[in-house]
Amino acid sequence: MVPYRNPRHQHVASVLRSGG
């Protein structure tokens, strides 16, 4: 599984990183 490679997960990671 490569979330950092998935363009769709990138958005999710951004939200999680932002904290919400």
Swiss-Prot record:
Residues 1-11 have a biased composition (Basic residues). Keywords: Transcription, Transcription regulation. Residues 1-20 are annotated as: Disordered. The keyword Transcription applies. Involved in the transcriptional regulation of pufB. This is Transcriptional regulatory protein PufK. It comes from Cereibacter sphaeroides (strain ATCC 17023 / DSM 158 / JCM 6121 / CCUG 31486 / LMG 2827 / NBRC 12203 / NCIMB 8253 / ATH 2.4.1.). The gene is pufK.
